[in-house]
């Protein structure tokens, strides 16, 4: 089976968030037994890991968007995946000068790329075309209008239903969509407005989200009734599939960045397991200038944005200071009031012996924190899937979370973590934190049971890939 994915980011080459990681993991697992290709835009200024000698083939691709255009397809293989980068030769201003993946003109840029991607897929053929998020929503309509050779199914995965790709009718008129297919993207209440996600929902054969609970939650999203109508119309062809994580890379037994390696097997002797965690904690505290004592360590490894619950993060800081345990927050935070507030907190707590805020991100440091921490706090307002709770469990770090989306699917209160429900109740959140801290301090038997359940949790890439294959083959 030939499976072609298209998106605007792919972690080994370029990424801005979880979409790139999720696509990489899925494609890697599918490539073991199937011909798998990923088609993304070429961002010359942003690629850092790609060298010209890696490219094994090029071809010219004519496409239509705001007139007759031409693209060049560059391809190479990465871990069994054919990666194709499309360079829009006739419209170089759209991607070649981009300093970031996302800009102020994303709808037009991504529609131009989608037109080129659809033309490439029509030429190359595919059994399954798998689209990722609204950015490539136009591909669905173009391939329905003019299917590629041997096309059996178009699958759309919603990594974040909150982003939808609102744009003008004029942008879609620049493509070769006829009036019938263009109407799938239009809003009835405002025919001059189109929504790339809306059209993709109607033009795809099957829709998935990245967790079962999130699939249920989006059916209750009434923020735009026309988008609600579109997702409701597809509810019998909608399924939530939990993302997997790469256990070959995320493995505390072999992770080269840890001060002390350890494994699930080591937990047969809990004392030895926790001693290994303690060695990692000691090394991390020395790096961050924290005071080492017997108090628990909680971490937050997350973008600091509205979705991630910044007000709860601030409550966690207060709770840590009041209850004398360590809290480490690491994550990027871009502009606005949230950035200002957390920058002030970072500065005011710079000399705190037990709270550290790092407004940056390092994969190496993140793994060292996973290995050292006793708990990871994830107080998201919504969370389509979430990977950090699964990585935490892999490293024997107990998740304390809000029960939403993929967090609700992976963390059971009192079994393999702790959870709260109300997205507006600080009291419930603080009670959950107190319960987790008290369990660690006062009930070691219960704590060991919870850590054991974390280590026994499994959500690997192969399991997720097999569920997608079931959809492909239906």
Curated annotation (Swiss-Prot):
Q: Which residues are involved in binding ADP-alpha-D-glucose?
A: 15
CDD domains, sorted: GT5_Glycogen_synthase_DULL1-like (cd03791)
Q: Name one GO molecular function term.
A: alpha-1,4-glucan glucosyltransferase (UDP-glucose donor) activity
The free-text function statement in the UniProt record for this protein reads: Synthesizes alpha-1,4-glucan chains using ADP-glucose.
> Gene for this protein?
glgA
Q: In which pathway does it act?
A: Glycan biosynthesis; glycogen biosynthesis
From which source organism is this entry? Answer: Chlamydia muridarum (strain MoPn / Nigg)
Q: Which UniProt keywords apply?
A: Glycogen biosynthesis, Glycosyltransferase, Transferase
The question of whether Ligase is a record keyword is answered with: no
Please list the GO biological process terms of this entry. glycogen biosynthetic process
Q: Which enzyme class, named as a word?
A: transferase
Q: For this protein, what is the EC number?
A: 2.4.1.21
- What protein name is recorded for this chain? Glycogen synthase
Recorded hits in InterPro entries, A to Z, give: Glyco_trans_1, GS/SS, Starch_synth_cat_dom
- Pfam families (alphabetical): Glyco_transf_5, Glycos_transf_1
Q: Which family does it belong to?
A: Belongs to the glycosyltransferase 1 family. Bacterial/plant glycogen synthase subfamily.
**What reactions does this protein catalyze?**
[(1->4)-alpha-D-glucosyl](n) + ADP-alpha-D-glucose = [(1->4)-alpha-D-glucosyl](n+1) + ADP + H(+)
């Amino acid at each position: 089976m030939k499976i072609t994915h298209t998106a605007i980011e792919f972690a080994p080459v370029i990424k801005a968030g979880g979409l790139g990681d999720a696509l990489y993991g899925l494609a890697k697992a599918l490539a073991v037994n199937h011909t798998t290709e990923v088609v993304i835009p070429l961002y010359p200024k942003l690629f850092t890991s790609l060298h010209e000698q890696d490219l094994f083939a090029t071809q010219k691709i004519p496409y239509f968007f705001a007139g007759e255009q031409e693209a060049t397809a560059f391809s190479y293989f990465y871990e069994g995946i054919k990666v194709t980068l499309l360079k829009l030769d006739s419209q170089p201003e759209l991607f070649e000068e981009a300093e970031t993946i996302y800009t102020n003109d994303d709808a037009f840029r991504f529609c131009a790329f989608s037109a080129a991607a659809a033309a490439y897929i029509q030429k190359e053929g595919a059994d399954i075309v798998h689209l990722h998020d609204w950015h490539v929503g136009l591909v669905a309509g173009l391939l329905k209008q003019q299917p590629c050779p041997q096309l059996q199914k178009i699958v759309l995965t919603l990594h974040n239903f909150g982003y939808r790709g609102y744009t003008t009718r004029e942008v879609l008129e620049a493509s070769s969509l006829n009036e019938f297919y263009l109407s799938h993207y239009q809003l009835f209440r405002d025919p001059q407005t189109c929504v790339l996600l809306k059209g993709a929902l109607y033009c795809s054969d099957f829709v998935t989200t990245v967790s079962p609970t999130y699939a249920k939650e989006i059916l209750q999203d009434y923020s735009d009734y026309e988008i609600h109508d579109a997702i409701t119309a597809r509810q019998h062809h909608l399924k939530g599939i939990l993302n997997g994580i790469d256990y070959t890379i995320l493995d505390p037994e072999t992770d080269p960045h840890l001060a002390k390696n350890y494994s699930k097997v080591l937990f047969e002797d809990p004392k030895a397991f926790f001693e290994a965690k303690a060695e990692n904690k000691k090394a991390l505290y020395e790096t961050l200038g924290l005071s080492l004592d017997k108090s628990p360590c909680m971490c937050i490894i997350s973008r600091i944005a509205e979705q991630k619950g910044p007000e709860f993060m601030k409550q966690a800081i207060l709770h840590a200071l009041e209850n004398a345990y360590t809290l480490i927050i690491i994550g990027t935070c871009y502009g606005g009031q949230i950035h200002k507030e957390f920058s002030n907190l970072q500065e005011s707590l710079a000399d705190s012996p037990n709270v550290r805020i790092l407004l940056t991100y390092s994969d190496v440091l993140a793994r060292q924190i996973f290995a050292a921490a006793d708990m990871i706090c994830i107080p998201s307002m919504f969370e389509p899937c979430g990977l950090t709770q699964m990585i935490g469990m892999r490293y024997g770090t107990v998740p304390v979370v809000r029960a939403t989306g993929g967090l609700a699917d992976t963390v059971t209160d009192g079994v393999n973590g702790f959870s709260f429900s109300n997205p507006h109740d600080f009291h419930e959140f603080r009670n959950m934190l107190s319960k987790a801290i008290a369990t660690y301090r006062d009930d070691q038997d219960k704590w060991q049971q919870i850590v054991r359940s974390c280590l026994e949790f499994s959500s690997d890439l192969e399991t997720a890939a097999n569920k997608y294959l079931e959809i492909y083959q239906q």
